[in-house]
Amino acid sequence: MLDKIIRIATRQSPLALWQAHYVQHLLQANHPGLQIELVPMVTRGDIILDTPLAKVGGKGLFVKELELALLDGRADIAVHSMKDVPIAFPEGLGLVTICEREDPRDAFVSSHYTHLDDLPAGSVVGTSSLRRQCQLRERRPDLIIRDLRGNVGTRLAKLDNGDYQAIILAVAGLKRLGLENRIRYAMSAEESLPAVGQGAVGIECRLDDGHTRQLLAPLNHRHTELRVCAERAMNIRLEGGCQVPIGSYAELEGDTLWLRALVGAPDGSQMIRGERRGPAAEAEQMGIELADELLSRGAREILAAVYLDNPAR
């Protein structure tokens, strides 16, 4: 069973390579002697850096090339940041494993200010996420929000060069890259509700590859799977891509799941929030019901306007 080399498709960014090596470590810890090769690739999202993500088109922006490698046999598994995983998969492929979640919160990063509330009016804050932008604008309409693209190192360099007074990044990415010291504080879910699946690593493979699926089975983290299942069910119902102003965050308290969600107008003028508590075993249904509630309260109109403005989604 261990004589076959498992090839991992991954993006080439430092964070993506960290995730691929993390999965490699977990696989080899569970299957000593297993041979693994990394297949680094460049995705469309890595190439187009001069356009806001929402304008480029969010669905599959960072995963399509990896999925093609799975389909044509160049790779056996693809490792993704769950917040980049589209709501639908090509025929024959599927998400089979979700690893234990890292801290899913957003991080406030600044060279001179310790908190979002400390920023003077007119300060420039960098983020390309419509989800982060709408929450920032709701809380601090006096700030200037500008797009910020590139890998983590590039974004930090732009901050250090003085292009921005602060930037918002994922806590998980900074921790994984050994840059936790750059975090001024982790923003609470009340202040900045995370993205669907944020902080979790997912593994995609060919659904008919029983051998590989058997190798991956021990890596699945059930608690994380339940939480992300609820978040993704909500997102699927909303027909949300990766680059839309949707936040969703599920927490497990014993056998009870607490799911919070929001849909916001990018300018922060309208925010629709909701939450559900229920049995963790009903995670998917909770996500669907919460999405339906948000849609009935105006989320449909907000998202329609976003998609009209960003037709490439």
Curated annotation (Swiss-Prot):
Entries under Pfam families matching the protein: Porphobil_deam, Porphobil_deamC
Pathway assigned in UniProt: Porphyrin-containing compound metabolism; protoporphyrin-IX biosynthesis; coproporphyrinogen-III from 5-aminolevulinate: step 2/4
CDD domains the UniProt entry points to: PBP2_EcHMBS_like
Reaction catalysed by this enzyme: 4 porphobilinogen + H2O = hydroxymethylbilane + 4 NH4(+)
Keywords: Porphyrin biosynthesis, Transferase
Superkingdom of origin organism: Bacteria
Location of S-(dipyrrolylmethanemethyl)cysteine modifications: C242
Keyword presence, Transferase: yes
Role noted for this protein: Tetrapolymerization of the monopyrrole PBG into the hydroxymethylbilane pre-uroporphyrinogen in several discrete steps.
Record PROSITE patterns: PORPHOBILINOGEN_DEAM
Gene: hemC
InterPro entries: HemC, Porphobilin_deaminase_cofac_BS, Porphobilin_deaminase_N, Porphobilinogen_deaminase_C, Porphobilinogen_deaminase_C_sf
Subunit structure: Monomer.
EC numbers on record: 2.5.1.61
Any single Gene Ontology cellular-component annotation: cytoplasm
Full protein name: Porphobilinogen deaminase
Gene Ontology terms describing biological process: protoporphyrinogen IX biosynthetic process
Similarity annotation: Belongs to the HMBS family.
